[in-house]
Design a protein with these regions (language model features):
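N-terminal pre-ligand scaffold of iron-sulfur
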Residues: 1-58, 71-72, 76, 84-108
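Short cysteine clusters
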Residues: 44, 63-66
């Protein structure tokens, strides 16, 4: 079962912004879309650019290297069905963003 690991403080990621963090050795991009926090793999699959420093427009981030666009709410590519980066469960507790990396146990 994956544990939720502290990734950042909520005040570090105001609405409309993003950041890249390392969680358990994994690079993850965190986004605040209208007060909702989302986490996906930080590396753009096209050229490995950091999505955490990409341009966020609504729920879509554009990689600054080659313009690849990814929906941060689910990791999917809006213009290409079937392609996605990993997305991760997120919880915000007492102003702390926590992200689960790895498999989760199914709810019982």
């Amino acid at each position: 079962m994956a544990d939720f690991v502290e990734a950042a403080r909520l005040d570090q990621v105001p609405p409309g912004t993003s950041m890249a963090v390392t969680i358990a050795g994994k690079e993850v991009a965190i986004f605040n879309v209208d007060g909702h926090i989302h986490a996906i793999d930080d590396a753009c699959p096209h050229a490995g650019g950091s999505l955490g420093i990409g341009k966020l427009d609504g729920r879509v981030v554009t990689c600054r290297f080659h313009g690849m666009r990814i929906d941060v709410t689910n990791g999917c590519f809006p213009a290409s069905s079937g392609f996605a980066v990993a997305s991760y469960p997120v919880m915000v507790i007492a102003g702390t963003i926590r992200v689960a990396i790895g498999p989760l146990e199914p709810a019982s």
